[in-house]
Amino acid sequence: MPTITAIAAGEARFNVLVSALQYVDTALPGTNLLGALSGASANLTVFAPTDAAFGQLAKDLGDTGSVTNETAVTSFLVGALPVETIRDVILYNASAGAKTLAQISANPTIATLNGQTITADGKTLTDKDPDLINPSLVQTNIAATNGIIHVIDRVLLPVNLPGNTDGTFTDIVAASGAFDTNGADFDLLLKAVQTTGLAGALANPTADLTVFAPNDAAFLKLAAALARSAPDHSP
């Protein structure tokens, strides 16, 4: 069974994460984050953001380039954030002790390696940035010899990072991305908004609105309820 570092280095979806680890270790001698994640006795839980998660963070911070280009995303983040902030973000995405999803659900307040906490609610993780969509767990319980990895679709942030501006309602809902199995995001709501022609009105930055936004799980419950209540026309 491989270590946490070996798993991250061996999967293309974690290229930006590995590059960030290497950058911090080089820029801050003695940090040795890669070494810590390789240690046989590390016993860590890592919430590992995908490349797409880092791309979304770059976009949130004002990157107008290609957020699917891993090299460009890494370069933007390195230029936009102090190395100490990148280090703290990485440490905030890790916790001492290997924790399965069941253990996280039983004890949802999680102490991280940078001294702050995150809170789990189902598969949603609440961080310290009040402006951006909270990360969701998209794959869980990946076992390593020295801990466990849970894959997340956005980067956990220990602070309200400068440069990230509040998006419009449409921006926030569209950030969910393409249709997937994550019931905590807003793929179905976005489709409904687009289908009804409301996307433009809800994208107006001067609109002063409160929106009660049902997530995908809520829409699926509605569909199931409507199916149960529909009349049976079978012969």
Where would I find each of the regions flagged by the language model?
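Mature, structured domains of secreted/extracytosolic soluble proteins
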Residues: M1-P235
